[in-house]
Curated annotation (Swiss-Prot):
Domain of life: Bacteria
Cytoplasmic face residues: 1-6, 67-107
InterPro entries named in the record: UCP028770 (IPR011223)
Name of the encoding gene: yiaW
Similarity comment text for this entry: To E.coli YibI.
Topology versus the membrane: Multi-pass membrane protein
Compartments (UniProt record): Cell inner membrane
Pfam family, one: DUF3302
Main location class: membrane
Keywords, alphabetical: Cell inner membrane, Cell membrane, Membrane, Transmembrane, Transmembrane helix
Topological domains, Periplasmic: 30-43
Annotated protein name in UniProt: Inner membrane protein YiaW
Transmembrane stretches, start-end: 7-29, 44-66
């Protein structure tokens, strides 16, 4: 009789550990996003709960989404290439020349 109650207690304990373990596991992307001050941390948290109902299909994408952002560099997709800066300077110079030509022709 004692072993029946003990087995029932172990079964309930294992069920609770698995239940709360899955919940904690799905909060990992949110915790990463919160630590990195991610601008979409709330959306990642909600999507983590939605992934519980979608059989965890989107959970790996949430992990990637949470780890892509860093406050010091943003999304890491900005290109600070020198050629872009040179082109911007050339365009500014051409616009200045065009404005000078327009002002001289108006006189």
């Amino acid at each position: 009789m004692f072993l029946d109650y003990f087995a029932l207690g172990v079964l309930i304990f294992v069920f609770l550990v698995i239940f709360y373990g899955i919940i904690i596991l799905h909060d990992i992307p949110y915790l990463i996003a919160k630590k990195r001050n991610h601008p979409h941390a709330d959306a990642i948290h909600v999507a983590g709960w939605v992934s519980l109902f979608t059989l965890h299909v989107i959970w790996p994408f949430l992990w990637i989404w949470a780890t892509l952002y860093r406050p010091e560099r943003g999304w890491g997709m900005q290109s600070h290439d020198s050629s872009v800066m040179q082109l911007q300077q050339r365009i500014a110079g051409l616009e200045k020349q065009l404005a000078d030509i327009k002002s001289s022709s108006a006189e």
